[in-house]
Amino acid sequence: MKVEVAIGEIFDKIAILDIKLARIQDSERLKYVRGERDVLGVALQNEGIDIDLELYEELKDINTKIWDTEAGFRDKEAKKEFDEEFVEFARLNAKYNDERFLVKKRINEHYECEIREQKSYDRLYNAD
């Protein structure tokens, strides 16, 4: 199946797959991650799209924060520890997801992409 998506979504997916390639140890899972990463890389090449490394790295850094926050959140939830740290993980997750949205928006604008993600709420989260 082929679906047209915003370029920011493709950058996001590639960043997440690259994080998985660095962190997943299971060879069977890695096979699928590599396969998906290769498909997306070829798709960008076929479209003549070069990845803006600065925007990509910014998005990857945010996705790494989300990954780490989500891991802490899941660990706390598994232990049924719904304490202050659990709440902080939830707040950070919302904050980082909004930062991620803003970077994807900049990517879409940079590439003049007509498909653009929209949030249903008016204000972005501020965990400060």
Please give the residue ranges for each predicted region:
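Extended, charge-rich alpha-helical interface modules
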Residues: 1-128
